[in-house]
């Protein structure tokens, strides 16, 4: 989850006064069925105006608001007030154990996650089956291990020939930085199935696999994902680091927020309080899960990437930094707008929204600011982190339409740069700078070591490009014309600088 608070459901002002007083004992799980639209509050409504708030970092009251039905913890006094208000209220469960009530609300009657969701071992097993059946289309890469239990974190590379790294743009999709946001894993697994099954049969899928390298990380936070999918605790967001060093893990809310651990304005993001849901850890890349993603980015430059979260039906893109947009805002925002327009909301009445996110500690500012990758957080679904089974296929299908839109942008327009040594023809790691676009907010982009390649999405038109490499003469191209619809090739051969005797 990206933003901490979305205000979802309204009750009487008297109920809020009860809530805002001394600590309230809430032994009831209550469902408000068919809540009137007027009782669904807009983002930004403050507590004390007659509304309960759904807070993604808090499980004290409202636990989910899906399809107009509200699941909330309540005291007996609050239940009476809801009934007085004429709401259609059903007591789902009564228990003195708060976790049991939360499990009933988020897991369902069996107090276990519905099997429509995949456990990590099931994901790995299915991916291995696909790789065995189609070894040319999908291969497994171990990119790291989890912080606490040293479980392998896997990425999967898909293309028409995965037996070798190919000289083409790469795109990344990942899920479950936050372990309770399990929808991300479902979307990535569905995409894996689609790519393998569709190659050679669906024209669009075949074109993607023939022109791109597609990387999938279904679950970044494997330890935390296991906590949720095992039925231990549906609230679990963070990894399983034993922060207090007592040798005990899995006691809520211990752990580190994996999506606050990236080294881009790290100290500005999250909190240094270990008890908070967005605890950022001891230092940047303190968590092995973040290091695994960094390792993947070290081995392959990505043109575009998506990190799936829940909830909100919104796409966050880089960024608004003290009110200033990202250097590539014109292109990034256009892509976000297009992708969002292709993802239908759960109620079928609209499409996802877009918003610039903050510039600190999360995946998208790091991938963009440090690596030049246009990275997006897509908050899937609305009103919960664990969605009822009936909602899952629709959310997955809607987001696969977003994948289609995103991958269309991997065809350009922009520059397909290749930098080589003018004498040997060997690829060079060279800085490729567009001074009219890039400023000191972001790191300079470089061609890769294997191919001397850099794919750079740009608006059509003329661009100044400066290519430099230590020991070589700098090349300045003042009016490099980028075409309208596809990649414009730019081959740069650098000449060694004269050495002083």
Model regions and ranges:
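Metallocarboxypeptidase
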Residues: 223, 229-422, 429, 454
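Short, acidic Ser/Thr/Gly-rich low-complexity loop/linker segments typical of extracellular
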Residues: 426-460
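Soluble metallo-hydrolase cores and metallopeptidase-like ectodomains found primarily
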Residues: 115-171, 243-247
């Amino acid at each position: 989850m990206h933003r901490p608070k979305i205000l979802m459901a309204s009750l009487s002002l008297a109920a809020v006064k009860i809530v805002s007083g001394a600590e309230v004992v809430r032994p009831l799980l209550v469902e408000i069925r068919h809540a009137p639209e007027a009782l669904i509050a807009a983002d930004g409504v403050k507590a004390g105006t007659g509304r309960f708030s759904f807070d993604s970092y808090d499980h004290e009251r409202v636990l989910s608001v899906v399809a107009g039905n509200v699941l909330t913890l309540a005291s007996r006094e609050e239940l009476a007030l809801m009934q007085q208000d004429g709401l259609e209220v059903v007591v789902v469960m009564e228990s003195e154990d708060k976790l049991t009530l939360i499990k009933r609300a988020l897991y369902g009657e069996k107090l276990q996650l519905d099997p429509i969701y995949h456990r990590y071992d099931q994901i790995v097993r299915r991916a291995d089956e696909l790789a065995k059946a189609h070894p040319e289309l999908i291969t497994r890469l171990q990119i790291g291990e989890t912080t606490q239990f040293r479980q392998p974190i896997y990425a999967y590379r898909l293309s028409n020939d995965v037996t070798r790294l190919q000289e083409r743009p790469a795109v990344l999709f990942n899920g479950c930085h936050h372990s309770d946001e399990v929808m991300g894993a479902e979307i990535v697994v569905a995409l894996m199935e689609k790519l393998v099954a569709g190659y050679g049969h669906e024209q669009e899928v075949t074109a993607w696999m023939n022109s791109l390298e597609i990387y999938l990380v279904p679950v970044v936070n494997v330890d935390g994902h296991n906590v949720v999918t095992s039925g231990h605790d549906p609230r679990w967001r963070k990894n399983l680091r034993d922060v207090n060093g007592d040798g005990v893990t899995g006691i809520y809310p211990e752990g580190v927020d994996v999506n606050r651990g990236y080294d881009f304005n790290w100290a500005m993001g999250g909190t240094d309080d270990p008890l908070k849901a967005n605890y950022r850890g001891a230092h940047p890349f303190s968590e092995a899960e973040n290091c695994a993603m960094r390792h993947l980015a070290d081995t392959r430059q990505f043109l575009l990437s998506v990190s799936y979260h829940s909830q909100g039906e919104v796409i966050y893109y880089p960024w608004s930094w003290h009110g200033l947009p990202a250097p590539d805002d014109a292109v990034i925002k256009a892509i976000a707008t297009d992708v969002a327009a292709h993802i239908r909301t759960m109620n079928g009445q609209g499409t996802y929204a877009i918003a610039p996110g903050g510039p600190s500690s999360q995946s998208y500012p790091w991938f963009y600011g440090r690596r030049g990758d246009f990275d997006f957080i897509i908050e899937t679904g609305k009103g919960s982190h664990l969605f009822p089974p009936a909602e899952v296929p629709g959310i997955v299908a809607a987001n696969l339409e977003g994948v289609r839109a995103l991958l269309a942008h991997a065809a350009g327009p922009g520059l397909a740069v290749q930098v080589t040594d003018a004498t040997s023809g060997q690829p060079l790691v060279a800085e490729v700078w567009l001074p009219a676009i890039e400023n000191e907010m972001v790191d300079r982009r470089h061609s890769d070591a294997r191919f001397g390649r850099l794919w750079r999405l740009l608006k059509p038109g003329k661009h100044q490009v400066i290519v430099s490499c230590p020991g070589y003469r700098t090349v300045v191209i003042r009016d490099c014309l980028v075409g309208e619809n596809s990649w414009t090739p730019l081959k740069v051969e650098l000449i060694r600088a004269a050495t002083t005797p």
